[in-house]
Amino acid sequence: MLDITANTSLYDIQGLPLWENGEQVLERTVAGEGNMNLVLRIKTTRRSVILKQSKAYVRKYPQIPAPIERLEIEKAILEAISDQKSVASFSPRVLHYHAENYLMLLEDLGSGSDFLDIYAGNKLISPEQLSILVDYLTGIHAIDSVKIPASKAMRALNHQHIFHLPFLADNGFNLDDIQVGLQALSKSYTSDERLAKQVTLLGKRYLEEEHALIHGDFYPGSWLEVGSDLKVIDPEFGGMGDAAFDLGVFLAHLDLAKQPPGYASLILERYTLPVDPVLVQGYRG
C-alpha cells in the first residue's frame, strides 16, 4: 500500500494512478481537519480535486484502530447520493477509486467552513439552513434499492464510543479536560443501572437495524457552508441503518451547541418520512 501523508511530494502524488493523460499535479494542501482520513486538496493543470486515503487507524487519534476499508463504504454511499436528484448537489461526486491503496478522488466542492464554531457560540444555524439539512436527511433516508457494503466494523467502532465507553465508571477519559466539573457530573449516569439497560437496548438496535440509508455521523463537522450553499460530507460511518439515529445525533449536537430550543420541533415537523419520535429522543439522549 502507498502511504500518503500531508508531506508527500508532488512527484509521488503525480505517480498515483489517478490522473488523466497529460494532467500535471501543481499543488497539494491539507483540506480540513480530517478526523478519520487523510484529506488533501490537489490542484492540477486541469482541475482542483480532493484526495482521501484511509488508514488502519483514526487519523486524529492514531492509537484507535479503525477499519481501513471504510472508504469503500463511503464511495458506495456517495454514488447512491449522486444518483438521487434531490440530494445529489449536497455531496461530492466520486471521480476515481483505487481499492488497492484505499485512495479516493472526489469532486472539490470549493473552499468553505464547517459548523464546528457553533459549540463555542460563534455561529448560529439559521432556520433556512436547518430546513435544508432536514431535507438532506429526508432525501438520503428515502433512497431505496441500493447496495452498500456491510459496515459492521465501522458500526461497531461507533457503537463502542457512543453506547459503551461513555457509560463505564472507569473509561479512561477525564471529562474535566473538556469542562471542569463534568467528571463528577458523569457519575450519576455511569452508576445508573436503569439507564445502562436502556442504552444497551438502544445500542443493540443501532447495530442491527438496516431499514434506511443513513449518513451515520450527522454533526456540525460534516456540514459545510460553501458560499451560499450547504454541503454534507464524510458519510464513512453510514450505510443501511436506523433513520432515527441520524435525527437523534442531529438534535443532540444542536443541544450541545445551545441552538434555539424550538429547532427540535422544527426538525421533526419538516422530516416527512415515518419515524418513531421515542427512538429519536432516545438517540438524542
PLM ranges: what are they?
Residues 76, 244-275, 285:
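Active-site activation/catalytic loop segments of kinase-like enzymes and analogous catalytic loops
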Residues 10-14, 76-82, 198-199, 268-271:
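Short, well-ordered amphipathic alpha-helices
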Residues 1-27:
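Juxta-kinase regulatory segment immediately upstream of eukaryotic protein kinase catalytic domains
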Residues 29-44, 49-51, 197-245:
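Active-site acidic catalytic loop and adjacent metal/ATP-binding pocket
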Residues 1-5, 152-202:
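Active-site catalytic-loop/activation-segment of kinase and kinase-like phosphoryl-transfer enzymes
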Residues 31, 41-152:
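ATP-binding pocket architecture of kinase catalytic cores
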